[in-house]
Amino acid sequence: MARSWLRARSDEAERMDDAAQGEAAFRSALRDLEFLNRISFGYRPTLRWLDRLVARTGVRSLSVLDVGAGGGDMLRRIDHWGRARGVAVALTGLDRSPAAAAAARAAGTPGAWITADLFDLPGDARYDVIVSALFTHHLPDADLVRFLRWMERHARHGWMINDLHRHAMPWIGLWLGTRLMRLDPMVVHDSTISVARAFTRRDWRRLTAEAGTPARIAWQLPFRWAICTEGKA
């Protein structure tokens, strides 16, 4: 039953995507999302990819754009990563929600911030690397294909997507865990929808082929995918 239940991506809306959500509710949800990312090692795939890219290219400075940056927690981890490895990072967060910018500033997120739809950025905008985490499952397939092509054009050295795997086990785990830990109601509501909107390896193969973007598709524990280019010259 579970296999057929999650066979195709859901199009059910997440509350976090609702612009009517107030700033206080949004910030509360972001705090609990950061907690979930921390206990599930959700930052590790992106930071390991940055390690590989720096080792391959030899660069000692990087401009980084985080798309769908939320409260800036990934940018804060990348800032710490850069300091620990002696890599200068110029960080930019991008999120279309004004509440995200306010939450990121309140949390002390370093770098610049852009409140806009990513496709509204200037055509000549370029960054050394573009990353996103738990963002692509918010997009319908057609917009995701467009996003893959967009990153290929706008990233000098490479890009990396870090997102969920659609499967019954994480769905059940999040349904139980978010309730047992009494997390924010928006997180409780959205967590299982996020899994249902997420991707399988077959999805990623189809979508990257449609976009015409060569990419590495790698399984990440627990129940995540890393979709990335491994570094341009």
Question: Residue ranges of each PLM-predicted region?
Answer:
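C-terminal alpha-helical "lid/dimerization" subdomain adjacent to the S-adenosyl-L-methionine
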Residues: 164-208
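A short, conserved alpha-helix within the catalytic core of class I
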Residues: 139-150
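Class I SAM-dependent methyltransferase Rossmann-like catalytic core
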Residues: 19, 23-54
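Conserved Class I S-adenosyl-L-methionine
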Residues: 197, 201-233
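Class I SAM-dependent methyltransferase SAM/SAH-binding core
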Residues: 65, 71-120
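Conserved beta-strand signature within the Rossmann-like core of class I S-adenosyl-L-methionine
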Residues: 155-164
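N-terminal auxiliary segments of SAM/dcSAM-dependent transferases
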Residues: 1-19
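A conserved beta-strand element that flanks and buttresses the S-adenosyl-L-methionine
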Residues: 131
